Amino acid sequence: MSRVCQVTGKRPAVGNNVSHAKNRTRRRFLPNLQTHRFWVESENRFVKLRLTTKGMRIIDKKGIDSVLTDIRAKGEKV
């Protein structure tokens, strides 16, 4: 499973670890992904999504039905 948020599309970023001596080594910044089940009243079932905590806040704000239509418009099967 890829480390991509289904709501925001956020994916791992690449940067550097910087030591006290300013030595730089490459590293990945991973998104804060969570797997969460949401109850969808209109479909009378649970939907499991892999999303970041920011994606959860977006669902709190817009509602699960609105977010699911956006995800399905992108072509993802949910």
From Swiss-Prot:
Keywords: Ribonucleoprotein, Ribosomal protein. GO terms for biological process: translation. SUPFAM superfamilies: L28p-like. It comes from the Bacteria. GO terms for molecular function: structural constituent of ribosome. GO terms for cellular component: cytosolic large ribosomal subunit. HAMAP family: Ribosomal_bL28. Belongs to the bacterial ribosomal protein bL28 family. This is Large ribosomal subunit protein bL28. The gene is rpmB.
